[in-house]
A protein has these predicted regions:
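Active-site-proximal beta-strand elements of phosphoester/diester hydrolases
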Residues: 10-15, 47-49, 139-145, 165
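Conserved small/polar residues in nucleotide/adenosyl-binding loops
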Residues: 162-168
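Zn-dependent metallo-beta-lactamase
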Residues: 1-44
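Metallo-beta-lactamase
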Residues: 4-8, 102-153
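Divalent metal-coordination and catalytic microenvironments
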Residues: 9, 40, 49, 79-81, ...
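Structural motif
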Residues: 45-46, 74, 162
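Active-site metal-binding motif and surrounding structural segment of the metallo-beta-lactamase
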Residues: 54-101
Length: 168
């Protein structure tokens, strides 16, 4: 997969893995899986999620292309399972100015995966359920979804992209 334009400011940088035959070592996936990750280009640039180690090189190439020489301000981590969060520490090392956004449980799991020193406390933006983060024209709002899959899962929406019709 290469970079996909989702909108004028949002780019898909995820990777399609057609070589994997079992998801989580037990569920057949005859056509593979997609590791979804996005870059939001605004006054401050945010990367949403990383990908599995299997796809690191292609993903980093996509991220580099999407950033076009700029540096991200934030990495938003929605879920720490390795197929989503395997490259958190790697990306943080590549961009030492970048802050990492997650909830308290996210960082607890991150320390278990990468060690407490992987993401320095001053680089962590710990969000609460319903809090928002402005990138400029885009404002990300975080909604916790514990046990949708794992206890730390959260989702993000950008209200500027939601279109609601007026009642008739």
């Amino acid at each position: 997969m290469s970079v996909k334009n989702i909108s004028s400011a949002i780019l898909g940088v995820g990777v399609d893995d057609t070589t994997i035959d079992l998801f989580e070592s037990q569920y057949p996936v005859p056509t593979g899986v997609s590791y979804n990750s996005y870059v939001i280009r605004d006054e401050k640039i945010a990367i949403l999620d990383t990908v599995d180690d299997r796809a690191t090189d292609e993903w980093l190439a996509n991220v580099t292309e999407a950033l076009a020489g700029e540096k991200p301000a934030y990495l938003v981590v929605h879920h720490m399972e390795p197929d989503h969060g395997a490259n958190v520490a790697r990306l943080a090392a590549l961009y030492p100015e970048m802050q990492v956004v997650g909830n308290a449980k996210t960082f607890q799991y991150m320390e278990q995966f990468f060690g407490a020193e992987a993401i320095a406390k001053e680089r962590r933006v710990v969000v609460k359920d319903g809090e928002s983060l402005s990138l400029g024209a885009h404002t990300l709002t975080f909604v916790f979804a514990p046990m949708v899959h794992w206890p730390e899962v959260m989702v993000t929406y950008d209200l500027s992209l939601i279109h609601i019709s007026e009642p008739t």
